[in-house]
Amino acid sequence: MSGSTLGHLFCVTNFGESHGPAIGCVIDGCPPGMSLSEADIQPELDRRRPGTSRHVTQRNEPDAVEILSGVHEGRTTGTPICLLIRNTDQRSKDYGNIVQTFRPGHADYTYWHKYGLRDPRGGGRSSARLTAPMVGAGAVAKKWLKEHHGIAFRGGMAALGEIDIAFEGWQHVPDNPFFAPNASQIGQLEDFMDALRKEGDSVGARIVVEATGVPVGWGEPLFDKLDADIAHVMMGLNAVKGVEIGAGFASVAHRGSMHGDELTPQGFRSNHAGGVLGGISTGQDIRVSIAIKPTSSIRTPRQSIDLQGQPATVETFGRHDPCVGIRATPIAEALLALVLMDHALRHRAQCGDVRLPVAPIAAHLPDA
C-alpha cells in the first residue's frame, strides 16, 4: 500500500494493522553515533498508550517497543532502525456486526471502493493504533533534535467539544488525562466525557503543539515549505480535519499592520506567523493547531448501507476512544518532530556552510 512513508532524508515507513500480530516502523536516515535504547522511546509511547483512564479506549496494550535493527552497542549505526510493537489485546469478535456494513464517517467505505476489500477488525490499516510507531519514531527524532539543537516540544488540548480550555500553564499538562494546560477545568471535562460515554456518542477536540529552539533557516521555498510539510503530516493523523500554523484562520480578520511580526534588534514583537515565513523557520516557536473530528465508531444506531448497497443500521460495540483527541497530543508532537528532523538534515546537506556576519535576533522580546 502506497502512502506509508514520510520524509526525504529522515524517512519513516509505517507498517501493520490494528488487529495484526504487530505494528511498527522502519526509520531510514538516522545519523550514526547517537546513543539509543528502548528506554529512550518507551516514555513517549507510555504517554500515548490506551487504557490509561476511563475517558479513552479500554484496550489494554502495553505498547512495549523493541529495537530490531540499526543500533549496535547502544548507538545508532546509520542503517535502518526497525521499531516493533506487538499487539496483545485484540478482540476481533467485537467487529463481527460491521463486516457487511459501513460505519458512517469511517474509512470503511473508501477503503472498500479503493482496494476492493477491507480489514474490519479495529479499522485495520486506518486505525489510530498505527500512530504508536510514529510516536516511537518521533522519540528518536526528538532526542537527536534536543542533543544537536536544543529543540524542545510541548503541547496540549485547547478545546474538547464545545468547551474551550483556558491556558493556565504548560506545567499542568502531565497532571490530567486530557493533556490540558489547565488545572481548574478538569472536573468539567471529566463530567462532560462521563455524560458522553453514557450517551454512546463521541466528540472532537482541538490540539496545540509547539517546538521551541528551532533555528532560523529550516525549510524550502514553494512546494517543500516547512509549514506545508507540517500541514501534510498532521493531516495524516487519524481524524484530523483542519490544521493551522500560527494565527491560522484568525489571520483573515487581522490587518497587515497587526499581523506582520515586527522585528527589533532585541527580538520579534509577536509570532502570528507561527515561526514560519516563506516556508522557512524564523527562529521563533513553531506553533501548530489541529482540529480532530468526533470518533466515527460509536454505539448510537445510525443509517448506512451494506456491501450490496442496501439500507442498514450500524452500531459499533468495540472498544474505542470517545474522543480521539484525548491521546493526540504526544502523537502531534511526534509528527512535528519528524518533519523538523527531516528538514534539519536537508538544511545541513544544502546550506550547512552558510554563515552571516549578523546573528539572528531573539525569538521574542526579553519581557515577552
From Swiss-Prot:
User: By what name is this protein known?
Assistant: Chorismate synthase
User: What pathway is this protein a component of?
Assistant: Metabolic intermediate biosynthesis; chorismate biosynthesis; chorismate from D-erythrose 4-phosphate and phosphoenolpyruvate: step 7/7
**One Pfam family of this chain:** Chorismate_synt
Q: Name one GO cellular component term.
A: cytosol
Q: Which residues bind FMN?
A: R125, S126, S127, N238, A239, G278, K293, P294, T295, S296, S297, R319
Output the Gene3D superfamilies linked to this UniProt entry: Chorismate synthase AroC
* Segment forming the signal sequence: none
* Description of how the protein assembles with itself and partners: Homotetramer.
UniProt cross-references to InterPro entries, sorted A to Z: Chorismate_synth, Chorismate_synth_AroC_sf, Chorismate_synthase_CS
So which cofactors does this thing need? FMNH2
Functionally, this protein is described as follows: This reaction introduces a second double bond into the aromatic ring system.
Sorted alphabetically, the Gene Ontology BP terms of this entry are:
amino acid biosynthetic process; aromatic amino acid family biosynthetic process; chorismate biosynthetic process
- Record field: catalytic activity: 5-O-(1-carboxyvinyl)-3-phosphoshikimate = chorismate + phosphate
Q: Describe cofactor binding as the record notes it.
A: Reduced FMN (FMNH(2)).
Q: Which family does it belong to?
A: Belongs to the chorismate synthase family.
Nucleotidyltransferase among keywords: no
